Amino acid sequence: MKLSKLCKVGMSFLTKPYYRTRVLIKSGYYDNLSDEDFLKKIFPKYMGYPLDLENPKTFSEKLQWLKVNYRNPIQTVMVDKHKAKQFIAERVGNQYIIPTLAVWDSVEDIDIDVLPNQFVLKSTHDSGGIVICKDKSSFDFEAAKAKLSASLKRDYSKIAREWPYQNVPRRIIAEEYISELGSDDLLDYKMFSFHGEPKLTVVCSDRFSKTGTRMNFYDINWEPMGIHFGHYPPLPNEFPKPATYEEMKRLTAELSKDCPFLRVDFYEIKGRLFIGELTFFPGAGLETFRPMSKDYELGEWLHLETVHRS
């Protein structure tokens, strides 16, 4: 590492609590803390206010409460990138899932010869362990194995104590390659459901641009909510309601009917919906809302008094 970059990293560690906390988490510094103590330690560093687990009010606080107090085994199935497909197919139909081509227990088991010329490889237990092959003849298989091997070694549940990932079998799946999923113009629709009732949709755009992902929030009537979420500013222009919006609502309600909270991610490609993933803790519940009043507004939709501790 160049001296200038090393100095920059060191300065960030010393002056930015958010950055310092991420480095310490990655190093395993907090691994011996209980989930409750860990979350109370890091929450203020990310959010700017202390975590109250006894009387949580904001949406972000209530997500931390759910991490500590609500543990339904089906959640592990729903975040498993392989098993979630079966769950989705049984609930709403297999026409909404991206076909799986193969599953392996380790990178050494991957048989590239059985795959088509284009495919996607993913680790089943975390976020970010993805490799895309657009052409086998130029595909760097060794680099792909190195990336996936590093992903398989990572305990994703430790990063923000998202416990559902802890017991997901660490495997590699190969999926059908859908070219539109890599398009700069593709929109990602993330629908938030509270106690089985869809309440808002986040439209993610510019996912592959130099400026980074933008997020625009809409209420159930597709009215802009004016939310700036974490490091993802909204675009000034608004997006039209998708033609498949009512179908998204129906699918989200069905998939989330047994959940205090669930986010369902959709892609709309040539009029057809695909479900990307199911998420219980958007941004790990550690992304700021601006204005902060929106964090309280969403918190009012999550009724913890109806949730049975487990």
Regions found by a protein language model. Name each.
Residues 132-133, 210-217, 285-289:
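A short, polar/proline- and glycine-enriched secondary-structure boundary/capping micro-motif
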Residues 135-136, 193-197, 269-271:
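Short acidic-glycine loop/turn motifs at beta-strand connectors
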Residues 104, 125, 176-178, 193-195, ...:
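Short, flexible loop/turn elements at secondary-structure junctions
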Residues 167-171, 215-275:
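A long amphipathic alpha-helix within ATP-dependent nucleotide-binding catalytic cores
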